[in-house]
Amino acid sequence: MGDPKRPRKKYETPRHPWEAERLEYERKLMRKYGLRRKKELWRHQTQLKRWRERAKELMARTDPEAQREREALFRKLYDLGILDKKPEEATLDDILRLTVEDVLERRLQTIVYRKGLAKTPLQARQLVVHRHIAIGDRIVTVPSYLVSREEEEEVDYSPYSPLKDEDHPIRCEARGESPEETAAEE
């Protein structure tokens, strides 16, 4: 089995630390997706880079094993919701066209915000970390969790969360009502 080595770093830092255009782009993405640290963004960029490198390797190969690996890569990215085309219709060029925003859209934090369970991406992050969000019966506390197509419909408030109650003040605000209006209706 061998000796365990240091775990591989999951992200690569930019080659140059002070490129104004890149810094502005990163700031825009961090604000849009509610990221706390650039390391989170770099982790997703590195993952995307690895998928693209894999696609380039598979483009050059023509053996039957490469075809099986292509299908597995297409299936994986389709199941994660990153590729829009079905695995049978997808091409390696589709993988090469992916952007980091395609990956960021699949984060649990982003999906909670897009489904209207939170008013802002940062509130979505807080709800995830504070155990208010569940996927099916399973509470997930990792905002960067990549939600698959299957799981996307199951994202909701945790059954153990006080937010599950329709009359909770945060849910009333998300609907555009004040908690007082809801109480007055009853």
From Swiss-Prot:
**Alphabetical keyword list:** Ribonucleoprotein, Ribosomal protein, RNA-binding, rRNA-binding
Which cellular components does GO assign to this protein?
small ribosomal subunit
Give the Gene3D superfamilies listed for this entry: RNA-binding S4 domain
Which GO-annotated molecular functions does the record name?
A: rRNA binding; structural constituent of ribosome
Its function? Answer: One of the primary rRNA binding proteins, it binds directly to 16S rRNA where it nucleates assembly of the body of the 30S subunit. With S5 and S12 plays an important role in translational accuracy.
Q: How does it assemble?
A: Part of the 30S ribosomal subunit. Contacts protein S5. The interaction surface between S4 and S5 is involved in control of translational fidelity.
* Protein name as annotated: Small ribosomal subunit protein uS4
The organism encoding this protein is Methanopyrus kandleri (strain AV19 / DSM 6324 / JCM 9639 / NBRC 100938)
* Designated gene of the protein: rps4
